[in-house]
């Protein structure tokens, strides 16, 4: 327990909240423009070519976002919606692109888990 004199000398510091997605600035999603669309390889035990995009957000941040699902139509200057959520085997990728909104179309011929990939119910 500090004394009154110690508390006067230096006040108690508030606990700072550390966020896992700082570029979103406490928003659930952010809009951004793709500056580069490319593939990268995952960390050690895994092997693949994961599709990612470099995105300049409306908050001013330049981030790397993962493009989920099989096949995509994104290219440079595509306008996308970005949400938080990291990809465990891609270091530095802490955001996901939301499929089925703005310029990112939903995954073609998707039957299960459609809501996560922006696909309407098939007739």
Swiss-Prot record:
GO function term, MF aspect, one: structural constituent of ribosome
Function, in words: With S4 and S5 plays an important role in translational accuracy. Located at the interface of the 30S and 50S subunits.
Keywords, in A-Z order: Plastid, Ribonucleoprotein, Ribosomal protein, RNA-binding, rRNA-binding
Family stated for the protein in its record: Belongs to the universal ribosomal protein uS12 family.
Domain of life: Eukaryota
GO biological process terms, semicolon-separated: translation
Subunit annotation: Part of the 30S ribosomal subunit.
Descriptive protein name: Small ribosomal subunit protein uS12c
Subcellular locations according to the entry: Plastid
Major place of residence: plastid
GO cellular component: plastid; small ribosomal subunit
């Amino acid at each position: 327990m500090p004394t009154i004199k110690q508390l006067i000398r230096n006040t108690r510091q508030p606990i700072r909240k550390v966020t896992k997605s700082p570029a979103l600035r406490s928003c659930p999603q952010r809009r951004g423009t793709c500056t580069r669309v490319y593939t990268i390889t995952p960390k050690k035990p895994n092997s693949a070519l994961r599709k990612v995009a470099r995105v300049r957000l409306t908050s001013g941040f330049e981030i790397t976002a993962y493009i989920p699902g099989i096949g995509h139509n994104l290219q440079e200057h595509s306008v996308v919606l970005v949400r938080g959520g990291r990809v465990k085997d891609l270091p530095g990728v802490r955001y996901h692109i939301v499929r089925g909104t703005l310029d990112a179309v939903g995954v073609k011929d998707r039957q299960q888990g459609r809501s996560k990939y922006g696909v309407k119910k098939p007739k």
